């Protein structure tokens, strides 16, 4: 019983095996070329490979009567070149006209470049939209009357591509942006082409036989003259198509044609170098095998099979077979074959596909060849290469537009290099400047500490050194030991803030507080902050100096007011500065900067203007200038506190005798 139940359960779990893999013999729907040649003619111009993979156009070549060429009398209307339909839209509708360009970055679509233009077609208002992505270019014309409200740029982009998912687009402000954009749009348009020309004689069914032919029949020579003009390769100035025009290593002559301002160079198999003993004739195959489209000329009725030539590039063939005509010239039968992933391309072949020699047929044939190459670009192998190339070019365009737009607004440029550690030495150069400034400030500190009892009156009410040597030491101009600017970056990627690395040079000095001598009524040093004339001039403009007449009175009044405050402040001095770097200003001043008042009349004496400034450099988006404080910071005596650095600004003038004032 158990075995029976288990058996039924196993039957339920059984599944049918997949069919066995088919061998190549199971996929042979077409006869081989040798089988076809064993039959009676006439034979078709093209035979499909045994395993398929190609399509054929133009299989009817029965000549019941001489074909008329009326359908080809107007090649400008019936025969036209097929290229990327969006490649010339920008040049036609946007370039030189009022329009707007934007750029953005989408997480899925990648880099986006968007162009829009207000257009009036007839009596109706329209929006012409052109969106470039890494895969393709979207174009549409939207009537404004169909919109409930006028859309913003993001909504406009979604009108042409619903997959757009960005918060905003950024305007392009570069005056030469149109040149960059039109160059990108038209990179898919080529004015130079190279096609292979293979001569197939009767009974030739392999690659080796095709490339080993050296003789040219009169019909083939006539066809080459019809196809283009014979040119000497030595010192040839036109498009050479990879042929050697200097040393003659790829033959002495070839066939060249200029068709509708497009240069075409033909790689003719019989004119390329022939190598004795080389069955594959690599000198010939390396040119024709690297072409994308080739013409196969048949003298007589021998079918051509597309897989005769092993090549990863050849995707389409135009087979032409000469047919004896009459006094009006020869007739040509034409068939076209291409790989399955190559889309159909025009102009379509007539039925029957037979042409009489003439300018109309030349127009048709050259147009067919050019359109064949454009169509081959859409094949899977070339489409991947094209997508990678397009993505790289679009990224380059995006970066160019962004950099130039930022530069037009005074942003980016050298600032981006400095914050990324490149340009101007980066971090290491800044660090060396900081260390250099630190040593200078410490030297000044040592000199000031050596002579603590020699003081004189300063403009702010403190006492300045009367010794000339000390005055020189104190005359070191605005020592900037380190710099920590905070910049507000306004760009498409949000507020990227980057602060250059600076080191606060704070020297801790411990000194015993001693009472001043009996004759000295004030401490060693006193500091007070003075209200500047404007907010932004606290560290830039020189303070107003009193005249010599009332100098003593002013100093006496301020010294009395600072008496209590000076006792609580530290006698040690530290040199530090906070310098704010505004947007768009290149270069960093980390050296010594002096503010001299020697040019002011009646100011002959040397003064030291000492002030306490509160470090108000904001790391927020504002980044306002450091502002002065009316009263000293509560923790001013703590020299090791980096949040409240002491800023000592020294103004030096000509070194002359300084009057001593007593309180």
Swiss-Prot record:
Main location: Golgi
Expressing tissues: Significant expression seen in the brain, kidney and pancreas. Abundant in the cerebral cortex and expressed at much lower levels in the spinal cord. Not detected in the lymphoid tissues.
Recorded consequence of changing residue 609 to C: In a breast cancer sample; somatic mutation
Organism lineage: Eukaryota, Metazoa, Chordata, Craniata, Vertebrata
Any GO CC annotation of this UniProt entry: cytoplasm
Role played: GTPase activator for the nuclear Ras-related regulatory protein RAP-1A (KREV-1), converting it to the putatively inactive GDP-bound state.
UniProt-recorded name of the protein: Rap1 GTPase-activating protein 1
GO BP field: adaptive immune response; cell-cell adhesion; cellular response to glial cell derived neurotrophic factor; establishment of localization in cell; negative regulation of microvillus assembly; negative regulation of neuron differentiation; negative regulation of thyroid gland epithelial cell proliferation; phagocytosis
Consequence when changing residue 100 to E: Impaired dimerization
């Amino acid at each position: 019983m158990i075995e029976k139940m288990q058996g039924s359960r196993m039957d339920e779990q059984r599944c049918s095996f997949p069919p066995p893999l088919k061998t190549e013999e199971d996929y042979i729907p077409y006869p081989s070329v040798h089988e076809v040649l064993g039959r009676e003619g006439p034979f078709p111009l093209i035979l499909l490979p045994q395993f398929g993979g190609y399509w054929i156009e133009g299989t009817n070549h029965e000549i019941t009567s001489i074909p008329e060429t009326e359908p080809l009398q107007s090649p400008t209307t019936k025969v036209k070149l097929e290229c990327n339909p969006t490649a010339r839209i920008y040049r036609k509708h946007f370039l030189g006209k009022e329009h707007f360009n934007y750029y953005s970055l989408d997480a899925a679509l990648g880099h986006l470049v968007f162009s829009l233009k207000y257009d009036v077609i007839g009596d109706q208002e329209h929006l012409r939209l052109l969106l470039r992505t890494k895969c393709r270019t979207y174009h549409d014309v939207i009537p404004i009357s169909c919109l409930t409200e006028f859309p913003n740029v993001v909504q406009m982009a979604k009108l042409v591509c619903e997959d757009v998912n960005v918060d905003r687009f950024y305007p392009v402000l570069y005056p030469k942006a149109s040149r960059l954009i039109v160059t990108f749009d038209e990179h898919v348009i080529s004015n130079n082409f190279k096609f292979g020309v293979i001569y197939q004689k009767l009974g030739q069914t392999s690659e080796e036989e095709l490339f080993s032919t050296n003789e040219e029949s009169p019909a083939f020579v006539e066809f080459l003259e019809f196809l283009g003009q014979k040119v000497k390769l030595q010192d040839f100035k036109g498009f050479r198509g990879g042929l050697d025009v200097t040393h003659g290593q790829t033959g002495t002559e070839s066939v060249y044609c200029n068709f509708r301002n497009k240069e075409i160079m033909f790689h003719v198999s019989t004119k390329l170098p022939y190598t004795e003993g080389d069955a594959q004739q690599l000198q010939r195959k390396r040119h024709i095998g690297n072409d994308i489209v080739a013409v196969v000329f048949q003298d007589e009725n021998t079918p051509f099979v597309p897989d005769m030539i092993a090549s990863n590039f050849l995707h389409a063939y135009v087979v032409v077979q000469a047919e004896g005509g009459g006094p009006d010239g020869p007739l040509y039968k034409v068939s076209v074959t291409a790989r399955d992933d190559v889309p159909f391309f025009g102009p379509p072949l007539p039925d029957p596909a037979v042409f009489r020699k003439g300018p109309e047929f030349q127009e048709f044939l050259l147009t067919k060849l050019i359109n064949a190459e454009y169509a081959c670009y859409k094949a899977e192998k070339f489409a991947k290469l094209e997508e990678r190339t397009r993505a790289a070019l679009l990224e380059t365009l995006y970066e160019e537009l962004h950099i130039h737009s930022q530069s037009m607004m005074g942003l980016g440029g050298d600032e981006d290099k400095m914050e990324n550690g490149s340009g101007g030495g980066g971090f290491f150069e800044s660090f060396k400047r900081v260390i250099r400034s630190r040593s200078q400030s410490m030297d000044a500190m040592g000199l000031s500490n050596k002579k603590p009892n020699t003081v004189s009156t300063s403009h702010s009410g403190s006492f300045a050194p009367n010794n000339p040597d000390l005055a020189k030491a104190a005359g070191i101009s605005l020592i900037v030991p380190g710099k920590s600017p905070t910049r507000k970056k306004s760009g498409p990627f949000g507020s990227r803030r980057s602060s250059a690395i600076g080191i606060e040079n704070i020297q801790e000095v411990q000194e015993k507080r001693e009472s001043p001598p009996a004759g000295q009524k004030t401490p060693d040093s006193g500091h007070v902050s003075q209200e500047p004339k404007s907010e932004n001039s606290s560290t830039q403009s020189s303070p107003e100096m009193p005249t010599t007449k009332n100098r003593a009175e002013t100093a006496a009044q301020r010294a009395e007011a600072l008496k209590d405050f000076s006792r609580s402040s530290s006698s040690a001095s530290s040199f530090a500065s906070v310098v704010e770097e505004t947007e768009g200003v290149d270069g960093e001043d980390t050296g010594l900067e002096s503010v001299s008042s020697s040019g002011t009349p009646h100011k002959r004496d040397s003064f030291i203007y000492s002030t306490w400034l509160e470090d108000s450099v904001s790391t927020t988006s504002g980044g306002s200038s450091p502002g002065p404080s009316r009263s000293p910071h509560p923790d001013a005596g703590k020299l090791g506190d980096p949040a409240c650095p002491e800023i000592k600004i020294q103004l030096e003038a000509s070194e002359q005798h300084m009057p001593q004032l007593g309180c």
